[in-house]
Amino acid sequence: MTPIGAVVRACLLEVSRRRGVIVLLVLLPMVFYLVRRDLEGQSIRMLALGLGWTVSTVALFVAVSARGIDRRLRLSGYAAWHLVVGRGLAITACGLPLAGMFGLLIAVDQDVDRVWAVILLLVTTTLIAAPLGAVFGALLPRDLEGALALLVVLATQMLADPSERLAKILPFWSTREIGTYAIDETGYDYLARGVAHFAATWLLLIAAAIAISTIRLRLARIPAPQVTQGGA
């Protein structure tokens, strides 16, 4: 098995053992949705952001809980990017089925013409959330601080004016743009901006997570002892 495959398998086993995590993955976005179910646009946007916060928080918890074994894995020959990519794939594999399930729920429960765009909205939000949680997990040593920091990011994204620069530099701005295209049936430019922002943010977050983990897990190089030849 490849190093990435081994990390994916270990991460999936870890998540599957925590029933509370599985309940959180399903319940929290659903609560976000039901609170605003009578308002079509707001309910879908709340569902997407709830899914993003949940997936990123699970990614954060996985990264923080694995800190104790990361250095041992590095000593065993695993590169830092093996750990980041493997866990990212595992968390994404947990989130994408939920994105499909919630997309089906919206198709049945709401009168939306662009259902495919809603599913795209949920998928891109999930893909952004996994490396976002990894970045916070690499930066912050405790899961409580990381979860609160993610909550601040989410709240700021919800409250900021989408046209302002602050909203555009936050990771879930693509969620708002693609959501506007899917729900309000605006022009293609909203979709194009959202997809472009998603792609750039996704690549940036993955690169940041790998860079931070590489620095944090770098191995100290011990110089080889110098052998001196004694005289007769």
Language model features: what each stretch is:
Residues 35-38, 140-173:
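Transmembrane helix segments
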Residues 1-34, 222-231:
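Aromatic- and glycine-rich beta-strand/loop motifs that create alpha-glucan
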Residues 35, 60, 97, 101-105, ...:
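Alpha-helical membrane-inserting segments
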Residues 88-140, 195:
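Alpha-helical transmembrane segments and their short interhelical loops
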Residues 42-65:
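Long, hydrophobic alpha-helical segments
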Residues 15, 57-80, 87:
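Transmembrane helix boundary and interhelical loop/hinge segments in multi-pass membrane proteins
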